[in-house]
Amino acid sequence: MKISASIYSNKEKDLETLVRELDAHGIDMFHIDCFDDSVFKDIARIRAISKTSIDLHIIHPHPESFFTLIDQYKVDFVSVQYNPEIKGDFFRPNGVTLWGLAITLKDSLAVVGSILQRADFALIMASEPGVSGKPFDKANFQRITDFKQQFPQKKVQVDGGVNDRIAFVLRLLGVNSIVSGNYLMKGEYLGVGMLNLHKTPSLQE
């Protein structure tokens, strides 16, 4: 199971220092919440020093407004937060980017099913989108099971309140990647947080 580090969860370190430290510990992806196009300046800074994949989460009523920048910076993964008000395209294949649909418990799989069929993966939001530090809603364990039954070929990423114990269960459920923000960034050592997210807890813990 891969780990995507939510870089904006760390306010103490400058971006370059944080990226180099995460890379030194073998992080799989850098997760960036996108509310406007200012994040692409940070993507450019990351691209200048790292080859690690960019994992962009668009939370905006007009995702198509970012398509040109996504193409320009060759963003590896893009998930678009579902919003029934979105009238244009959710995705634009470019031969590089893998596209996902981000959904919450409020979003019925029956309603978003036709969009999910066109996506490469789903980002299941287990807490409020774009808000760091919120707890994991355990109702999402069943949501993941339901999703995998309905869309067995789709990969699943989970974001929101993921700690080492939650990560253990998500791995058992077949989740492909997790986003870690507070848990990974707020610990004293990044390496310890990475190890804890990867390891299997003992029954005595």
Residue ranges of each PLM-predicted region?
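Short secondary-structure boundary segments
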Residues: 34, 82, 103-105, 126, ...
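Glycine-rich phosphate-binding active-site loops on the catalytic face of alpha/beta enzymes
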Residues: 82-86, 123-132, 173-194
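Conserved N-terminal beta1-alpha1 strand-loop-helix module at the mouth
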Residues: 1-77, 85, 106-119, 139, ...
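Glycine-centered short loops/turns at secondary-structure junctions
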Residues: 26, 74, 96-98, 174
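Short beta-strand/loop segments at the ligand-binding rim of alpha/beta enzyme cores
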Residues: 1-4, 50-57, 91-104, 150-158
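Active-site/ligand-binding-proximal alpha/beta "capping" segment
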Residues: 124, 128, 134-172
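Internal catalytic-core helix/loop-beta-alpha segment
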Residues: 98-106, 110, 120-126
